[in-house]
Regions:
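Structured catalytic-domain cores with a bias toward divalent-metal coordination
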Residues: 1-237
Length: 237
């Protein structure tokens, strides 16, 4: 464990330094504690054949097992992303990528690195974990790291940023989902409602704007105006 104090308090920051560990890469050997740790991590990983940075989501939304990469590295990384048994691969603009993350720093330094994201923050989803584990072993077999009979991995949906619709709260209130999990949805299907908690009035009725797949869904019921409720990848509008 590279951050035992953070594990104790459920944070990826080092206590007392107020620094997010995934915002200080590639680090600085002469910097603050978090920066020095980050520099040590990068030094250990440099020279590796491949790196997979595994995340849960935050505590507010649930994510379908997915792999994320920016469009600068598509040619090099997309073949790896397809091996990881994810449901979804999201290719987004490099303009939106933070250059102080582990994945950005390692890719910049020549180590092929992908980010896998799934589930909800501070929670372990066994089904999602086993799904990704199959993908990791499949990738290692393809890279010659592991010898075994490869399992069959699923073919992920490949999406670019322009194909993703963000559904946000227009009012503050309590979000009550109408669907239990991420998955296939049709245009006009009910995703959920925002309820006024005192009177029980429906403040906002949220429907899918397209046929497609919900790959992000609000988990925390308390929402404020502008909060993310769902992300939908789709075709027909």
């Amino acid at each position: 464990d590279i951050n035992p104090l953070g594990i104790d308090i459920g944070s990826r920051g080092i206590p007392m330094f107020e620094l997010d560990m995934n915002r200080v890469f590639p680090g600085d050997n002469n910097g603050a504690v978090a920066e020095s740790v980050a520099a040590g991590i990068v030094s250990d990983i440099i020279g590796s054949d491949f790196c997979l940075d595994i995340h849960s989501s935050n505590i507010f939304v649930r994510e379908m097992p997915q792999v994320r990469l920016n469009d600068d590295n598509v040619d090099k990384l997309l073949p790896y992303a397809k091996m990881l048994n994810a449901d979804f691969v999201w290719i987004f603009s490099s303009i939106t990528v933070l250059d102080a993350t582990l994945a950005y720093s390692l890719n910049h330094l020549g180590v092929p690195t992908l980010v896998a994201e799934m589930g909800v923050g501070n929670r372990i989803n066994k089904e999602y974990s086993l799904q990704l584990l199959d993908g990791i072993f499949y990738l290692m077999i393809q890279l010659g790291i592991w010898e075994d009979e490869p399992v069959k991995v699923r073919e992920p949906i490949i999406s670019t940023e322009g194909e993703v619709n963000f559904l946000t709260a227009k009012e503050s209130g309590i979000f009550v989902p109408a669907i239990n999990s991420c998955g296939i949805i049709h245009m006009g299907d009910n995703i959920g409602d925002i309820i006024e908690p005192i009177e029980g009035r429906i403040l906002q009725h949220i429907e899918s704007p397209m046929d497609g797949i919900v790959f992000t869904l609000r988990e925390n019921p308390v929402v404020y105006k502008g909060a993310l409720l769902a992300r939908v990848h789709g075709g027909r509008k």
